[in-house]
């Protein structure tokens, strides 16, 4: 009997992982089905929704990402943030466990940074973002998210929190990636906001 709670937790975690994997596959398939020209239009709409709506002071460090596969292209949004004084950075994958955020400068060339991504090279300054634009597979209206399965962002956020930092997390997705309910566990890291082509939604934690 003493083992039952432990076994129940293991079963619940297994079911949760299976559900997340199914949702991830389904929502990414929907994202992949968006025609390229439509994806561009939706990405530009995101820049319009959030370009001025996100409050930050000049010098604030904001991490974005260079789009791969069928991700939204947030480069227009990042350009708007830069014009307002943000310091931009993008992730570089060091290994299967670790990403760092390298400063993105217009004058710096981009190089391959792992898993099909591109960004500044090793000579770039490594920054700790205060606002993070986070790609994802699926999300719900509570701010719970499903990533790509590698856990890179979760570990990066964990390292920032160990430093005493609490970056604001803004999920980047298309409307088709929303689900009714993401199975969540106590250790999961939730979003503070979500940006889609329909608009920008802030959760209470953005202000808190």
Predicted regions and their residues:
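Surface-exposed, charge/polar-rich loops and edge strands
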Residues: 2-18, 22, 32-33, 123-132, ...
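N-terminal active-site beta-alpha-beta segment that forms phosphate/nucleotide-binding
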Residues: 6-128
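Short glycine-rich anion-binding loops that position phosphate/pyrophosphate groups of nucleotides
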Residues: 67-70, 137-141
